Amino acid sequence: GFGSLLGKALKAGLKLGANLLGGAPQQ
């Protein structure tokens, strides 16, 4: 449902934020 989608987006955002803060972007 919508909650599951939101959770996925949140997790992805946290991962991106951690990578950016760690100075190791995976792009």
From Swiss-Prot:
Keyword Secreted applies: yes
Entry superkingdom: Eukaryota
An individual GO BP term: defense response
UniProt entry tagged with the keyword Ubl conjugation: no
GO annotations of cellular component type: extracellular region
Tissue expression summary: Expressed by the skin glands.
Role description: Antimicrobial peptide.
Family, per entry: Belongs to the gastrin/cholecystokinin family.
Name this polypeptide is given: Caerulein precursor fragment R2
Source organism of this protein record: Xenopus ruwenzoriensis (Uganda clawed frog)
